[in-house]
From Swiss-Prot:
It is found in: Secreted. Gene3D superfamilies: SH3 Domains (2.30.30.40), Zn-dependent exopeptidases (3.40.630.40). This is Probable cell wall amidase LytH. Residues 124-146 are annotated as: Disordered. InterPro entries: LytH (IPR017273), MurNAc-LAA_cat (IPR002508), N-acetylmuramoyl_amidase_3 (IPR050695), SH3-like_bac-type (IPR003646). The lineage of its organism: Bacteria, Bacillati, Bacillota, Bacilli, Bacillales.
């Protein structure tokens, strides 16, 4: 009797079959675990389904970090409502994308499809007026801030009304209105100005806010103005202006270029450029109220 025959005679063949079955089952569990782990890793990747924007927070009021294109992929980190937190391309920072722009099959929802400006009351405050002319051009004393803030406000009113908003003006002609009397109720308040310095070198647009509930609107408008307008972007700044201080509503003060700068003055006086800025403001308000 050889060694194999001796071993088989010593051990029950049934036990050998059991060992084989148990071993195969353990191997199956190992393979299943590896497959599930690989699947979990894959599920953390999302694909952008259409051109979109990555933002610093989970709604459209947050500033845009950069644009992404259909087909781009990112690592998913977390979720807030219908917004997905992802790791940026270089892995150095986190950002957010609306879920309906991704492969996660998240619907935007009915609230994203309605007009965000419908039934919204927007207060427009054309700076200065009457005997308060505001800033003036260094080259032409006929170029007065009070005139261009009123032009911009009236043009912006038409654009906002076309978009479904109700608009109030703190002044509708060349009259002086005190700062106290510029306090009107609305869903958002926008004070329109042009900047000026003795030096002709200063240029660009600045968006001011004061209270914490005004910062998101300022960031959103600044982002949209930066995307469309040719004005140098000076960013957003917190400043204790009375028109911002005396309202509890989201409010900003726009300095749309330096009338003391020759290049900015050309853009301030140009209706086409003003319309570009006004469209950016309308887009920003839509974005803000859609969030």
């Amino acid at each position: 009797m050889n060694k194999v025959d001796a071993w088989l005679s010593k051990h029950d063949l049934k036990n050998l079959t059991t060992l084989i079955v148990v071993g195969a089952f353990i191997l199956f569990l190992i393979l299943l675990f590896m497959l599930m782990n690989h699947s979990d890793q894959g599920s953390n990747r999302i694909t952008v389904s259409e051109n979109a924007e990555l933002r610093t927070g989970p709604n459209a009021a947050y500033p845009v970090i950069y644009q992404v294109e259909k087909g781009d992929t990112f690592t998913r980190l977390s979720k807030s409502g219908k917004w997905i937190e992802v790791e940026s391309r270089d892995g150095s920072e986190k950002s957010w994308i609306a879920g309906w722009h991704t492969s996660l099959n998240i619907e935007a929802g009915a609230n994203k499809k309605v007009n965000p400006l419908k039934n919204k009351v927007i207060v427009l405050d054309p700076g200065h007026g009457g005997n308060d002319q505001g800033a003036s051009s260094n080259t032409s004393k006929k170029s007065l801030e009070k005139n261009y803030t009123l032009k911009t406000a009236k043009e912006l009113r038409r654009a906002l009304e076309k978009a479904g908003a109700t608009v109030k003006l703190t002044r509708s002609d060349d009259t002086y209105v005190s700062l106290d009397d510029r306090k009107l109720n609305g869903d958002a308040y926008i004070s329109i100005h042009n900047d000026s310095l003795d030096s002709p070198n200063a240029n660009g647009a600045t968006v001011y806010w004061y209270k914490n509930n005004q910062e998101a609107l300022a960031e959103t408008l600044n982002t949209n103005i930066q995307k469309k307008a040719m004005l140098f972007n000076r960013g957003t700044r917190q400043e204790n202006f009375q028109v911002l201080r005396q309202t509890n509503k989201p409010a900003v003060l726009l300095e749309l270029g330096y009338i003391s700068n020759p290049t900015d003055e050309v853009m301030i006086r140009n209706q086409i450029h003003r319309q570009v800025v006004e469209e950016a403001v309308v887009d920003g308000l839509k974005q803000y109220f859609a969030s």
